[in-house]
């Protein structure tokens, strides 16, 4: 039995990132698309961490295009793609596009390209090849109007589960919803293609009814019947997974899923996500640790850490992702304790227990698809 740990995903390994957009244009939209691409290219060129891009046209179908961009590492790209500036930059292109699919890859090997000296030095150490588990993880987060929390919880807990299978190769495996105050976090696990699964789920009548019931309670209004409004809402709500680590071997019985909410001080979200990812790497190698698997989600100054654990209260320090000396002090510097109602240093188990109680999100529903 394999009992080793594996990290199936990490935005913090230092490897270069290749982002690929597959674009299918509306008929007659080619010139508008090219103008929009020039606008986007000029804006992206000045973003720190962006190395370059290419625009390619299909030789079989001129309406199909491929945009690739390369980034020094994943964090600068994630900061850019989650920004309001990105939303405004890509808006002119959206009217031209019938369908668009985005994919992100770490550059693991490369031949036949002359790299600048600094990049050559970085490339002398090859990026790690990850052992995947066949699952893509993603989260959405949004806020509801204060005072509507209990109503929203009832709506989210009461809907009928949608059909899990999107097609022969894609299925929704697990959906878990949490709340912390007026913030909602929905995490999903997908076997196959994430975008295919999300589109499939969004079309299901059970889900559409829930989304409509939520609309009056949202702080940020949306019109799901308007493609541009719906697209903007879900882009702003996206909270990508930036790290996932798990122990190999059989899953212990009695695991419970928790989501821990870490609001960061302004500008510290990526540093906080990186700290938790590094700590989870260390913890996964300890067979006595309470956490069997963990996923770190990050957007702007919000970090959510999803953990499957037996009993976090018995070891609050490690359940919070704190291992070794001084890590509590580092976390305290990055964390917006006032937003959690917990201020001051994290110097002992009592402080950790208090923080764990304030950071632990309320579980609304946890649904697994039937195995098929």
Please identify what each model-predicted range represents.
Residues 1-64, 72-84, 92-93, 98-184, ...:
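Short S/T/G/P-rich N-terminal loop/turn motif that feeds into the first structured element of a domain
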């Amino acid at each position: 039995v394999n009992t080793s740990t594996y990290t199936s995903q990490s935005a913090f390994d230092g490897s270069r990132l290749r982002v690929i957009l597959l674009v299918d244009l509306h008929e007659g939209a080619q010139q508008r698309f090219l103008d929009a691409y020039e606008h986007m290219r000029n804006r992206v060129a000045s973003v720190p961490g962006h190395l370059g891009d290419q625009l390619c046209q299909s030789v079989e179908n001129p309406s199909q295009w491929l945009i690739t961009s390369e980034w020094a590492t994943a964090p600068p790209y994630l900061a850019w793609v989650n920004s309001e500036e990105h939303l405004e930059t890509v808006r002119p292109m959206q009217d031209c596009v019938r369908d668009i699919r985005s994919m992100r890859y770490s550059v693991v090997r490369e031949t036949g390209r002359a790299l600048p000296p600094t990049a050559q030095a970085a490339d002398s150490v090859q990026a790690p090849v990850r052992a995947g588990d066949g699952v893509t993880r993603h989260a959405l987060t949004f806020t509801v109007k204060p005072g509507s929390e209990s109503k929203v919880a009832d709506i989210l807990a009461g809907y009928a589960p949608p059909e899990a299978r999107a097609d022969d190769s894609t299925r929704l495996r697990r959906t878990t919803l949490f709340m912390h105050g007026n913030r909602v976090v929905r995490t999903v696990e997908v076997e196959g293609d994430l975008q295919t699964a999300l589109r499939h789920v969004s079309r299901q009548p059970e889900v559409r009814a829930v989304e409509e019931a939520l609309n009056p309670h949202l702080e940020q209004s949306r019109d799901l019947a308007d493609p541009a409004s719906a697209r903007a809402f879900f882009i702003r709500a996206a909270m990508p997974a930036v790290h996932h680590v798990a122990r190999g071997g059989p899953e212990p019985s009695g695991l419970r899923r928790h989501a821990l909410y870490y609001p960061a001080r302004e500008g510290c979200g990526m540093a906080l996500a990186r700290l938790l990812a590094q700590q989870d790497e260390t913890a996964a190698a300890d067979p006595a640790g309470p956490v069997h698997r963990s996923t770190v989600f990050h957007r702007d100054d919000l970090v959510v850490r999803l953990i499957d654990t037996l009993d976090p209260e018995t070891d609050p320090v490690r359940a919070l992702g704190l291992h070794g000396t001084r890590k509590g002090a580092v976390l305290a510097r990055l964390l917006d304790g006032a937003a959690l109602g917990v201020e001051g240093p994290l110097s002992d188990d009592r402080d950790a227990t208090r923080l764990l109680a304030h950071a632990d999100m309320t579980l609304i529903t946890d649904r697994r698809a039937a195995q098929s």
